[in-house]
Swiss-Prot record:
Residues 23-50, 618-630 have a biased composition (Acidic residues). It is found in: Cytoplasm, Cytoskeleton; Cell projection, Ruffle membrane; Endoplasmic reticulum; Golgi apparatus. Activates CDC42, a member of the Ras-like family of Rho- and Rac proteins, by exchanging bound GDP for free GTP. Mediates VEGF-induced CDC42 activation. May regulate proangiogenic action of VEGF in vascular endothelial cells, including network formation, directional movement and proliferation. May play a role in regulating the actin cytoskeleton and cell shape. Its main location: cytoplasm. The keyword Cell membrane applies. The modification Phosphothreonine is found at T555. InterPro entries: DBL_dom_sf, DH_dom, FYVE_RhoGEF_PH, PH-like_dom_sf, PH_domain, Znf_FYVE, Znf_FYVE-rel, Znf_RING/FYVE/PHD. This is FYVE, RhoGEF and PH domain-containing protein 5. The gene is Fgd5. It comes from the Eukaryota. The lineage of its organism: Eukaryota, Metazoa, Chordata, Craniata, Vertebrata. Residues 647-840 form the DH domain. GO terms for cellular component: cytoskeleton; early endosome; endoplasmic reticulum; Golgi apparatus; ruffle membrane. It comes from Mus musculus. Residues 869-963, 1120-1218 form the PH domain.
Length: 1219
């Protein structure tokens, strides 16, 4: 149903318009007649280019004349042209497109600036009297720009008093015939209209449109005027690198300083004078079309890059003011600069400065605001792809969504751009393009661009279609039209719209960070679909992000009425963006480790919930290789915060539970053990043996009942406090402060702890009854099977446990609370006692370190054991294929804790490796620097250190922890000694060997022959050596392979046959050189040749390599060498470095091609040689290069990995060069 205004007769409307502006009506009548002639003279789109070139050349010659006539003509005709903004709605799709064009002589001019129109609107409905309601996000800023000339004001003086309707400045086209042969698909078409067509419907539609627009402007601007700095906008032409015919240089808008005046805003030359444009004065009826002032104005329109996140990108439209005489700054728009006909876009190619207030105004897409909390999880799902244009989805109401078709994607209006050489519309849109400058080329004739909604990658396709355009429900909707010759009379409209469905999955009000700025141009029409990226895809390009401005959210409520849009995660085509470089969010951003870090390492930290779990950021190899790490994130101890319990309350409960166990242990010591020892000491006194020592021991044991009473009181207070607080803040620190004097019993016990233990051991030796008493207590259920020394250490251990628990508790308290200060005082009290323990006890520091490790490693039981000492800890990288994962190692003298770091700063135990059965080596691996291999009977670990010094330090500590009798056994076992294997109880073939890498052997490890193209490498599956084909012709069933036949070397074959017997007949191996089976008639018992072939051994055909004995004495991987490793060597006078394996043993330098070679290439006795380092110029430090001289003659130059390695090699060579 149309509104009452739409029912007014056309004659009445025309009379009103003429009455209000009689000059306009008369001029429009004449212009309409000219427009009809011009439409008839338009050429079809497929005509050649020569006509267009002639028109363009003629227009160029008239530039000076047009500019000279411009000012006078505008004064004579101040209201000759208007540009209106109206809705357009059409239910027709492709089949309705031709009739519409027939009725409407204007060409459809879809631009990217109209890509966010929410719906379509048909001409038929307007003609039938339906009045649409359109909300247009167009904001105008009066009062900014150059001062008005005397001809720049409206006749009625309302030029400065109409902030409701903006000025859309459009330069009219020439009245002559227009060549459409080369009409660009990206030029906004401008057609002409006769008076007879669509007159009535146009007036009605205009009234509805303008009234709707006026309502939107008033509501959005909140009665204020929005300033836009048009003075600081200039243009520049940016040609791309491709210097080809038809090349498309790009002209982008830039912001300049205040010194740039508006006269430099010209972009294209035309052959027509500048026209005035009419607007609606404030307070006048919307049906009365007024003339617009000629004052240069800018408009903020919402382009296609407006995203669902709630941030808009303004499309600034402005006109060149009269008197702009900088002809040299103008760019003639011809074939070579059709990158954006009439609409020049740029995505961050110039710095944007926002002058808009915070009253709900628009924000450019290149000035994206990211609301807190800073969360990039939703934009890090997939990398940027060239074929992923980001489009807009406009929110529809539930009623409108129910009327749509089954397809979840919105329909698109075809994109038909008509080129008008006289059009002088200047559009500044914040756009982006992912196309590189090398892809710039002429895009050919008019082209229709549409997005294939079935394409998963959202690559644009070429297709023509029309869509339904209706009044918009959101500020993202924009309907733009122009009337080139008419002002007060009815007019026809051409409307274009581009919709988007890609942003459906984005959460609301979360704008996307963009990548680096690039300029806009369009790819060739002949390229593939993924090159046809729309110009207005500014959702995945990086730009500089300014500080956030508040934006009203009430305007965008209808965009997110569908719950699926509001709750969805991220756009699948958005790329990851590192936001660490943006200064605006330095105080808000956090690393993933800091977000999940426990308050044990950072006090009073609130961790926000991350939208992307950490498991999503790990590689597939990491997830597959460490299932414990995935399960660790679901540890119940880590989920207390999610259950509503604070971390401080969890620590207090842990303190209570451990206190109960400690008090129970103290009761056994003070009652059972203390009483039994006192009775035994009385019997010793009766015997008269050293009463002084027994009295001292009795005094030391008297502290146990006092310590038990102290902790019994602490336990009762903790139970009462935690029972009363419930889920609130616990108060436990004052419990320790109230018993400050009683902790002196702990101090006295610690001071004489070592003395008491020594006296107890001596008394047990002197008194068998006391020794029996101690032994019975250790074996009883109260003793738990632990030694007396271990039980006594438990008493002191509790103080160190208090220290780590109170530290963690303190870090989870609010610094402003009273409990925070009390906890600091309690921690100071406990630290005084533990400091005494470190000073007086022999194992004080070691005990403290073991307590810290036990508290930090989850899954580890009691680390406190008699005789256990802490040696080293550190982080190494676990090597698994191409993946590298951090692993934290804790080395004690009897065990190695292999853990991986957790998010809260603690560690998850993966395995505990006994040091006694460990084999440690430093293998040389191609892609693993500073490798360290740890082998045990159960597992094999390959680790990588950060430096050679760190690797060597770990190797030294691990080797020192090995038992002396096991070191040589493990080292010999690594080098495949059968005798050592027997001593270690490792039978050949029962366990899979460690295969030698193929790059570590350049010759057979059995016979010493060199490997070549014909002599290939083969692994022995019994010992792991690399041997040649002649040395591996035998196979034997191995237990480690479930008795399957496997290739073994000759030495292992002999050993296996000697131990397990010959190969069973059913599994007997035929000669490799024979291609027919043993059951063949050729091998029958009656054949004379069978015995001959069977007697021939392949070893008889071996070519034994003649090797000097001096080169075969030492193997490359042999033990007992002073130093070994890879060095780069070059001969004197040459510059070519060659990487070789060098070994110094017995004052001889052996050179090998690889680390597992059996025979050396050469050997050099180092006696008499001198070593000199090569120092860098201007530096006294020794570099990685050093030289080997013999009698002042340069013999060799060597280059190590670093200076430390070079220093060790030089020291070893100097030692070997001296007798």
């Amino acid at each position: 149903m149309g509104s009452p205004e739409s029912e007014v007769s056309p004659d009445v409307q025309e009379q009103e318009a003429a009455t209000d502006n009689p000059e306009v009506f008369e001029e429009d009548s004449a212009d309409a007649a000219e427009g009809e002639d011009q439409i008839e003279q338009e050429e079809p789109p497929n005509c050649d280019e020569e006509a267009y070139n002639r028109d363009a050349a003629a227009a160029t010659m008239q530039v000076g004349e047009d500019l000279g006539e411009e000012g006078d003509h505008v004064q004579e005709d101040p209201a000759e042209e208007s540009c209106q903004i109206i809705p357009f709605e059409s239910d027709s799709v492709e089949e309705d497109f031709s009739p519409t064009l027939t009725e409407n002589p204007y060409e459809i001019f879809p631009t990217e600036s109209t890509s966010f129109c929410n719906n379509t609107y048909s001409l038929d409905e307007s003609a039938n009297g339906h009045e649409p309601v359109c909300e247009i996000c167009v904001e105008e800023v009066p009062g900014v720009g150059p001062p008005l000339n005397q001809h720049d004001s409206l006749p009625d003086g309302s030029g400065e008093d109409s902030p409701v309707v903006p000025d859309v400045v459009v330069v009219p086209e020439n009245e002559g015939p227009v060549d459409d042969a080369l009409s660009s698909p990206y030029v906004m078409g401008v057609g002409l209209l006769s008076l007879g067509e669509g007159a009535q419907s146009d007036t009605q539609a205009a009234s509805g449109t303008l009234s709707g627009y006026s309502t939107w402007e008033e509501g959005d601007s909140e009665g204020g005027q929005v300033p836009v700095d048009r003075k600081n906008i200039a243009t520049r032409a940016r040609p791309h690198s491709g210097k080809v015919a038809g090349h498309v240089p790009e002209t982008v808008l830039e912001e300049t300083g205040p010194e740039t005046c508006s006269s430099g805003m010209g972009i294209r030359d035309t052959s027509d004078e500048v026209r005035k444009i009419g607007i609606l004065p404030e307070g006048k009826p919307p049906e009365c079309v007024r003339a617009l002032p000629a004052k240069p104005r800018a408009f903020t329109l919402y382009p296609r890059s407006f995203s669902v996140e709630g941030r808009e990108s303004p499309l600034s439209m402005f006109r060149e003011p009269e008197g702009a005489g900088l002809d040299s700054h103008r760019v003639r728009r011809k074939e070579d600069n059709l990158s954006l006909p009439g609409a020049i876009g740029s995505s961050g190619s110039f710095s944007q400065r926002s002058h808009l207030p915070s009253s709900g105004t628009s924000t450019p897409s290149s000035v994206v605001d990211i609301p807190p909390p800073f969360d990039l999880a939703c934009i890090t799902k997939k990398p940027i792809t060239k074929s992923s244009p980001s489009l807009l989805i406009d929110g529809d109401t539930l009623e409108k969504a129910s009327k749509k078709k089954k397809s979840s994607f919105k329909r698109f209006l075809e994109l038909t751009f008509r080129k008008k050489t006289e059009s002088k519309v200047h559009v500044d849109m914040n756009l982006s393009s992912s196309r590189s400058s090398s892809e710039s080329s002429y895009h050919g004739p008019a082209r229709v661009l549409e997005l294939d909604r079935r394409s998963l990658s959202n690559s644009p396709q070429l297709k023509c279609r029309t869509g339904k355009l209706r009044a918009s429900d959101s500020p993202a909707a924009l309907i733009f039209y122009r009337d080139s010759k008419r002002k007060g009379v009815p007019f026809s409209r051409t409307v274009s719209r581009v919709e988007s469905f890609e942003d459906r999955s984005r959460p609301p009000f979360l704008p996307l960070p963009l990548t680096k700025p690039r300029s806009i141009s369009f790819p060739n029409a002949d390229t593939s679909d993924y090159e046809n990226i729309p110009a207005m895809n500014s959702d995945y390009e990086n730009i500089q992000i300014p500080p956030r401005r508040p934006v009203r959210t009430g305007t965008f409520t209808k965009l997110f009425e569908e719950q699926s849009r509001a709750l969805s995660t991220a756009n699948e085509n958005d790329g990851y963006v590192d936001m660490s470089s943006f200064n605006a969010f330095e105080s808000k951003q956090q690393s993933s480790e800091q977000e999940a870090e426990s308050a044990y390492t950072e006090p009073y930290k609130v961790c926000p919930i991350s939208a992307a779990p950490r498991e999503d950021l790990t590689s597939d190899e990491e997830q597959g290789s460490s299932e414990e790490e995935d399960s660790a994130s679901r540890d119940p101890s880590l989920s207390h915060k999610g259950e509503g319990q604070s971390r401080a309350l969890v620590i207090a409960q842990e303190l209570l539970s451990s206190e109960k166990a400690y008090v129970q242990m103290l009761q056994h010591l003070s009652l059972d053990f203390h009483g039994a020892v006192l009775r035994a000491l009385e019997n010793v006194e009766q015997e008269g043996r050293e009463p002084l020592a027994q009295e001292e021991l009795r005094q030391g044991l008297r502290e146990l009942p006092a310590i038990c009473d102290l902790h019994q009181g602490i336990l009762e207070s903790l139970e009462q406090r935690l029972g009363d607080c419930g889920e609130g803040q616990p108060q436990v620190a004052d419990i320790f402060l109230a018993r400050e004097q009683e902790f002196e019993h702990h101090a006295a016990h610690i001071l004489q702890f070592d003395r008491y233990l020594g006296l107890l051991a001596e008394s047990c030796l002197l008194s068998p009854r006391l020794a029996t008493t101690v032994r019975e207590f250790e074996q009883s259920s109260q003793g738990g099977g632990q030694s007396m020394k271990h039980r006594m250490l438990r008493v002191v251990q509790r103080l160190f446990q208090y220290q780590v628990l109170l530290t963690d508790y303190l870090n989870n308290l609010c610094p402003d609370s009273a409990e925070y200060d009390n906890t600091q005082s309690a921690l100071t009290l406990i630290s005084k006692v533990t400091d005494r323990a470190n000073e007086s006890m022999e194992q004080g520091e070691n005990l403290q370190k073991l307590v810290h490790i036990e508290y930090s490693v989850r899954g580890q039981g009691d680390l406190l054991q008699p005789g256990r000492e802490f040696l080293k800890e550190g982080t190494l990288m676990r090597v698994r294929g191409k993946s590298r994962h951090p692993r934290h190692l804790f080395l004690m003298n009897d065990t190695l804790l292999y853990t991986h770091p957790q998010k809260d700063g603690k560690y998850r135990l993966k395995s505990s490796l006994p040091v006694a059965n460990m084999k440690v080596s430093r293998p040389v691996m191609d892609k693993v620097p500073y490798a360290l291999k740890i082998e045990t009977p159960e597992s094999c670990l390959t680790l990588s250190a950060s430096s050679c010094a760190e690797r060597d330090e770990w190797h030294y500590c691990l080797s020192r922890a090995l038992p002396e009798d096991y070191k040589t056994q493990a080292l010999a076992a690594f080098h495949h000694s059968v005798e050592i294997r027997e001593r270690l109880g490792i039978s050949l073939g029962e366990r899979l060997p460690t295969l030698v890498p193929v790059t570590h052997a350049m010759m057979c490890m059995n016979c010493g022959c060199d490997f070549s193209l014909t002599v290939r490498r083969h692994h022995c599956h019994a010992c792991g050596k690399i041997v040649c084909r002649n040395c591996s012709r035998n196979k034997y069933p191995l237990k480690c392979l479930k008795n399957r036949m496997a290739k073994v070397c000759d030495g292992c074959f002999r050993e296996l046959k000697l131990r397990n017997g010959p190969v069973p007949g059913s599994m007997r191996e035929r000669p490799v050189s024979m291609s027919f089976p043993l059951s063949s008639s050729r091998f029958s018992s009656g054949s004379a040749l069978s015995s001959v072939f069977q007697s021939i051994s392949p070893s008889t055909f071996k070519k034994q390599k003649k090797v000097p004995s001096a080169l075969s004495e030492v193997a490359a991987s042999g033990e007992g060498s002073a130093i070994s490793g890879y060095l780069s060597r070059c001969k004197s006078g040459k510059r070519r470095w060659k990487k070789l394996w060098l070994v110094i043993k017995g004052k001889v330098l052996y050179t090998y091609l690889a680390s597992e070679d059996k025979v050396a290439m050469e050997s050099i006795p180092l006696l008499g040689f001198t070593i000199a380092p090569e120092k860098e110029e201007g530096s006294s430090e020794v570099g990685p290069v050093f030289h080997l001289y013999h009698k002042k003659t340069l013999f060799y130059s060597f280059k190590a990995e670093d200076s430390n390695s070079a220093q060790r090699w030089m020291e070893a060579m100097e030692d070997a060069s001296v007798l």
